[in-house]
């Protein structure tokens, strides 16, 4: 959805998902039967290099990007990247219906009432949700120019050319739209649980109708385990991932359950806000993505708490995966949803 207007089109874009715990690279080849995976690489990001979407250590992040690119074997330089976090504002607004040629100016005027930054300090984009009764409902997206410059700078430092800047939550929607082209006319909440940020995107009939980032994620689980068991953060993270580091799963359960309750409450607040803006529309299903989505028991717990189906994202459902990448895709699966959504982008493809 989000586009920087001054980059030019290229036919060989790849997805570069820059997270606070890992960098993920995905590239497809186009085909009449659908995209096929040609490159996949993941590299870890050290703690505190990226925090809640803010880059704290650009040189270290650039090295992680280079490592992921090397593991993927990507030969092109043109990347589609995503942003998330505190300097990203996503608002659902309503304005009187205006002619198409006047819409961007009208959105800018309305955005000034909803964005806590000076309008000349942000890149602004929008998506029309609906038109009815002489009014237009839109999702307005603003991200501080300084944040985009920060991300573009570190990507360029890694030797790449960022040609698309999207929003992580909307990239999540890109892959869902590809993999579920016959989505029923019900609201589906996509939730990507990253290390420090949860990205939510509510979709209906192939379009985003609500989106929000929540500063909560897998690091909350790691911190709770560290405090509960009095063990180092590195050991707690490994135990959370199911690695054999001398900690039984039963020992983790009290800490995990506490954080899962907190996660549920955070998301419920977002759902309540969505309901207040959506004319009593209700969410019919939840799809979890991100590295923390595969935490044993989490989907079942959330389903029982909210009383609606919860399932894991299948970002490669309609993508041809060669045998060489099958094991990595099976292992990472939902964690690659944003990278897949970014890999589907091309400059100019989302212009209104």
Each language-model region and where it sits:
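Hydrophobic/aromatic-enriched cytosolic interaction surfaces used to assemble or bind macromolecules
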Residues: 1-352
